[in-house]
Amino acid sequence: DYQMDEAMEAVRSDIQTIEMYRQADSLAQDTELLYDGTSEVLKRYCGLSEHNQKLFLDTLKELEIQLEYISEYPEDIKMIQENAQQLMSFSIFSDKNSFTYNNIIKTAKDFSKVSEVSLYIVDNNKAVEGLVNYYFPFYLSLIMMVFIIYGLSGERDNGMWEVVHSAGNGRLRLALHRLMVITGSGVIVTAGLYFSTFAASLFLYGGADSLSAPVQNIQAFKRFAMPMSQIGYVMYDYAYSTLAVIVLSMVLWAVFVLNRKRNHALIMTVLFAGLEVFMYFRIDIHSVYSAFKQFNIVRLMRVNEIISTYANRGKGSFVISESAIMFCVLIVILCIAAVVAVSGTVVMRPQQKRSVFTKILDKIYEGYQHIFSKMPAVVKELHKLLITSRGITVILVLLAIVIYFVGYGRMTFSDSMKQCDRIYLES
């Protein structure tokens, strides 16, 4: 503790010396009064270019923040446990069958696991911090899985479905092979994108020597209640994220299996994904519709936000962490989606009985084609481009995206912010 306090004092002194020098320099005062050649930090600072001088000062300030955090972390963890003991002494929290009581007990127990974690200064944590907050590899993984599943469903459109379905003993084998292909693809695609991004992050920021340091060295993980190294957390994040990609891929495969036309399944997928993105970014966390933001595909793919934040849910004496809830829900969805997809592949027939409604639609379509045959060639070409080739769908999707981003650029204010602004204007 003494060495830490000494280091903090030295860093603060260096920052103060540099800032006094910069202030004197900006006021065109005589800087020689400050720089007499004896200050090592000023000697290094003055030998740098203007750009590197700013980086040098910023680095010192970051070091000061990190030193303060490291020195306060043990006391912070100790205070969590002491607060738990104090809260249980109050009568309103003393009911042993209540969620509040059991949540206090679990919180104290969980953070006792990291009470012995020793933090220390490292070169930098930016490689891991940048990686776990960069979610595009998982979004790209899902997009690639859409293409893979679309390709696996090719027999629905190329006339081979009848041939595939006629092999009675082969349908289950085909379904199981596809199950393994989708699972393996999810693991490999996610690993390729995730670890290539990790390598790029290490190349860009450096800090490979810091990977063995506790992940709690990163200030964003001060409420992470598991003793784990930074490289350990990278693997932990990858495992959870891969599971999420595989589960969503299984759900997507089930959607493709249950739709007789894979293009219909693709359109449904795009529309649903667009709706999920819209709800995640447009619904406020305090809105009555916040459940659509909490239970959302986008939030599911932002795995780090869930597993790195300490939060419990439950009822009565049953208390469980959000990360555990996420894992259980993913496993349940995975099993259901896999069973539906495999069963659908085995059971669904290429042909289905024509209902009365289908026959009526066929008659309407015949009349439509009879009228359409008399149209000019230009109208037929437009019909082929917009309707037959589904160009109108692409146009509508692009239009919706443009309208969304145009509207998203506007500032939105809560009622409390509007009230504060009104008070300010009236005063």
Can you annotate each of these PLM segments?
Residues D1-S89, R410-S427:
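Membrane-proximal extracellular/periplasmic loop immediately following the first transmembrane helix
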Residues L172, R262-N263:
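Residues that define the loop-to-transmembrane-helix transition and helix capping
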Residues D1-A7, V11-D14, Q23, A84-E155, ...:
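Secretory targeting signals
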Residues S355-I395:
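Aromatic- and glycine-rich beta-strand/loop motifs that create alpha-glucan
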Residues V181-I182, V270-G274, L398-V402:
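Residue-level recognition of pore/gate-forming positions within transmembrane alpha-helices
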Residues I149-S185, P376-L382, L386:
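Helix-loop-helix units of permease transmembrane domains in multi-pass membrane transporters
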Residues D1-Y2, M8, I18, G207-G232, ...:
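Terminal transmembrane helical anchor/hairpin motif
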Residues T393-G407:
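Hydrophobic membrane-insertion alpha-helices, especially the h-region
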